[in-house]
Amino acid sequence: MQKLKCLSEIYLLIEQLPKPNQKIIKEAKNYQNQLTKPQGSLGILEDLSIFFCGWQNTLKPSLKKIQTLIFAGNHGVCNQGVNSYPQSVTSEMVLNFKNGGAAINQLCNHSSVNLQIIPIDLDNPTNDIYYGPAMNETELLVCINIGIKAVNKKSDLIVLGEMGIGNSTIASAISTACFGGSIAKWVGRGTANNDNKLSKKISVIRKSLKVNKKREPLKILMTLGGREQAAIFGATLAARMLKIPVIMDGFICSASAAPLFLLDNSSLDHCIFGHCSMERGHKLLLKSMNKSPLLNLNIHLGEGSGAMIALNIVRSALVCHNGMASFESVGVSNSK
């Protein structure tokens, strides 16, 4: 997908969202019913395999090329004391990723998947949303295009993750702006390790929402979002335009895509939500977008960890779909 020249192009793309192949989906459902098992007995694994058939336009979907994209950014709102860790940890963790020492490195190695780390202007945090917009239109466009550029059109699957001290505060602010309700219901601890920090986050978000009042989806992303959130938005949009399925990680990734959902409620139909984070707002956000997570493992790490674990569920679905024999091929009697 080519980079955007202006934000208004997004509205044109939303009107042209490609859809899964319904004919293939129907054939895939019938194919599943011919495999040597009671119909529906593999549960969500069957749904996943049919999902991939529809998006890949084939009865034999594959995952030969998987991209795991981790976007990193820093946030001006950290100046408000919403975190227990200094912002320098973002750069330090990016270095840890590059040196192979993080959880996501081990999960990618275990799954034989290449990991791409994409830091975005870490020495220049976004503006503090407590006082005004995080970004202007030019900055937002640059970051969205970074996400778009990261998606390889030959990929079979995109796994998304993030790193950024302060971005759970950003995710809560975006979610509240998108769907409303009590701020406290959207705010979890993140890396805040005491009640005072949690209260501080709620107070900061309340003020930030009053200062940044615009509720049009792209304005929400621009005024309240971070650079990594904008890049995730861009990568998600690019994947949709290329009909590439996506596995989303936790709360921050989901919140990054929420403005896209508001633009068109079907815009995330190519996305699998890998898990439900322990972050308080994630369960509510998934419900607001009518999405069901594959896993619930009490994970709240970020960095794509939950999504990468979910990848193994997806792979299990496809190996069963592609490898199982049919009743007819092995002479086993089917149900009547």
Question: Model-found features: residue ranges?
Answer:
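N-terminal loops that bind phosphate or other acidic moieties
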Residues: 2-336
